[in-house]
Amino acid sequence: MGETNSRLSPFLTLISERPVFIILAMSAGADREGQFRRMRETAREIFQQALAEASIDRAFAQHVHCEHGVLRVREDLYDLQAYSNAFVISIGKAGHTMVQALTEQLGSSLEGIVATSVERSTQVRGFRYFRGGHPTPNAESIQAASAMLKALEAQTESSLVIFLLSGGGSSIVEKPIDDEISLDDLVATYSVLVHSGAPIAEINTIRKHLSSVKGGRLARRAFPAQQVSLLVSDVPDDTPDALASGPTMPDTTTVEDCYRIAEKYELPRQLPPSTRELFERHALEETPKSDDPVFHRSRWWLLLSNQTAVEQAQAAAEAAGFVVRVDNSCDDWDYERAAEYLLTRLRDLKKEFGRVCLISGGEVTVKVTNGGMGGRNQQFALACATKISGESVTVLSAGTDGIDGNSPAAGALADGMTLERARVRGLEAGIALERFDAYPFFQALGDAIETGPTGNNLRDLRILMAY
């Protein structure tokens, strides 16, 4: 009997240890899944903190003050008693939020016009509101432009005009330069531009020269009033005149740039006849430049930009214990190229530092060929998901305005378990990527970033973490 037990003991030991092995394996899997979940939560927290710290209310409280009838905007002082009146024009996705912040500093006696793309349940007293279209103009976009042009024409040399500009203004306020261009043709033209694959700066170059309000033409209508523009920017810091297509700033682009861009992306053959004719006849008119007298009484101040959001995300990631690096070099790159570049950079940084966070600002481009539901941030995140399966990597890409493409989301999260979790639910990342249909994919996983419209617009943030 003792001999039998001796012979069986290895098998008994093996049998008794096997459940331990299974339990340990399951425990390791659960720990790894828990780590991915915690990192997704951390990425969300970093993004949310960046939004909170780069808010419009904070920027106005820091840079705009009024005391004893004197308005201070950064380094400028304006004695309000020296002007016959002050009139405010607010344009863009942050139009309402900026007016609210301004009235908190100056009081409720202001009046003006607000054009934004978000429907408001409340409005600031004294202001006329328009809900313009985005990413393409609508009837109210044209009505807003007409109302602004008429109001600015009534301003005098003793008037102070305060312009509040934010992203999205290019379509939210619009009036074609040629009356022969109908709203339908204008919408068709915008659609061609948005889906051309061109970066926003090139799109805005053409928008300026097709518009009665862009490229400094709104400032021309306000002349000779004193003008000051406050900017919440969704364009690169070195091209401020691209914000809302620069309605109050000297235009650094030319009609020759327009013709070159149109040829580069083969635009004329895609445009409706009324706008195509302007390109074919080279009939576009030049916009006002920096030496134009209309800008002699104009000032411009940047209050917030993508760099602000990047810096706040960096601070939040450092507080979370990451070594942080910032790389904005892929701004305006194709999303696939940007994903490959940033992931390669992240892997290199991980070898050097271990727990590392790579933050990238700006925007990637997507040339849409199939009409699914999503946007550039979700498309970028999905592309990353297909490249990081099994890796201890988490990627968040989202827009600071809370809106990504034609979806309800601001962006999405992806990590080394995304494809595995998707397969369990019968989701195919490759099909969603090909169809530009990323939102249903991420929404089903619970990894869509849904903030709702934030009232701000500082371009996009990409947060990549390796651990």
Kindly give the residue locations of the regions a language model identified:
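Gly/Ser/Thr-rich active-site loops/lids in small-molecule metabolic enzymes
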Residues: 180-197, 251-266, 370-396
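Short beta-strand segments
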Residues: 89-91, 113-116, 162-167, 229-235, ...
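N-terminal amphipathic/basic leader segments beginning at the initiator methionine
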Residues: 25-83, 97, 257, 271-288
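Glycine-rich, mobile lid/loop segments that gate access to catalytic sites or pores
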Residues: 137-140, 150-242, 247-250, 434-437, ...
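Glycine-rich oxoanion-binding loops at beta->alpha junctions
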Residues: 115-157, 206-207
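Internal helix-turn-beta structural module
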Residues: 382-467
